[in-house]
């Protein structure tokens, strides 16, 4: 991968999903580049499934993605960190007095999530199915940043990583929705 694996030069190509990059990898890359300044880094932005396919095809050296992920052959996975999604709303759909809404009530609101074929979509499809509900979307996004932007524009409710949502909540741009 890198000059004789000595980390004295060369390039590392990493397939990374958006959330994995923002929650985990950026902090690690900062430290890595300080320790190994002569190693070039090439990041390719993918959904989890696309990153795994890029790895299978030899287009990247390794992948850092969110779960769920389906690996085949001799691929291995290692959990590096965890995060928690919360339900968020823009001002139009914020709940008065932190009202708790039931999962079934989400069908009464426009709902935004990642497009079919993404790990996030698969995760929430299973989550709703496990709760005897259908995962019905009003809007599909290609990235989690698009989910955030659509929620901020009062287009509906959406799940978003709590760690990334907190700064927008503190500024009053979005609001957490308590879900039962």
Question: Which residues make up each language-model segment?
Answer:
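Hydrophobic residues within well-ordered alpha-helices
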Residues: 14, 55-56, 106, 149-155
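Ligand-binding cleft/hinge of the Venus flytrap
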Residues: 29-35, 59, 104, 121-134
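Alpha-helical linker/hinge and terminal dimerization helices associated
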Residues: 1-5
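Central regulatory/effector-binding core of bacterial HTH transcription factors
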Residues: 9-72, 141
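Short, well-ordered beta-strand segments
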Residues: 11-15, 63, 88, 112, ...
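Flexible hinge/capping segments at coil-to-helix
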Residues: 74-111
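Beta-alpha-beta core module
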Residues: 72-83, 145-180
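Secondary-structure junction motif
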Residues: 95-96, 110-131
